[in-house]
């Protein structure tokens, strides 16, 4: 019976039922307090595409993120789930209006740069044909509602309680307004920010509702535990290079490139076949909260819309007592620029 009903009911209807009766324990395992994780059939979902590859939608290869709204204030349980899953996703954890306030300021900045189509409301984030969009970290600077959302209030309170001590955050915000096309390749975050502690966490923030078509983040289930497969990748530094290798010196120092890109693969299905587990995602809404660690393999879905921008950010948090990666602190963090490069004798 559960499989039959989950096939008939759409994903959205099941979410609606959970919202109407958040405290009721239904006899069907996919419908309890919005926790519609693995028992839900994937037969009703659209075909998911990541980096140009169609994902296998079989229930043993694809699923929905675990919603931890039922444990939002139980940090002992959240730590347990983080250790088990490698991530924490809490639907509706943040005030939707505050997230949309940040979106409003972001789209105003995009509009001022001539990126948005003037025939549509700015809040719709419809890209003008031919406009340059994508990685926009500079737009996070001085964006008061975004800075307040990410670096004060409920977000920082979460990490303070999760770590059970004082925290600090990176001074750099990875803001993106991604148009139609391929999503982000499978990767882990540590190769880009591993010079300090390895216990820091990423917060991925959607600034608006993100359908499967618009393309949100996806994570590879259990990948944070596969150190056997990650050991030759995870501890590399994208800004490191061999001083005694003339080709690397030219590529990294002279040309400002990377000795390696930090990409794990260009093929999400192949990564899943190698690591096992399932690719997990959901349809995100403004106010949703997703955080994960440095060893978790993740990627993003392709933006399959005609002209809409998917607006999101990455921000990072850690214990204040632990060392921090110098590339991401200060009024003007050096990042992956010339001052962020590190030469080694290989």
Language model feature labels by segment:
Residues 1-9:
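Extreme N-terminal basic, low-complexity initiation segments
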Residues 157, 182-281, 322-329:
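Catalytic core of non-heme Fe(II) oxygenases with the double-stranded beta-helix
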Residues 41-68, 101, 116-118, 232-238, ...:
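Non-heme Fe(II)/2-oxoglutarate
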Residues 41-85, 91-186, 192-195, 334-346:
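Non-heme Fe(II)-dependent double-stranded beta-helix
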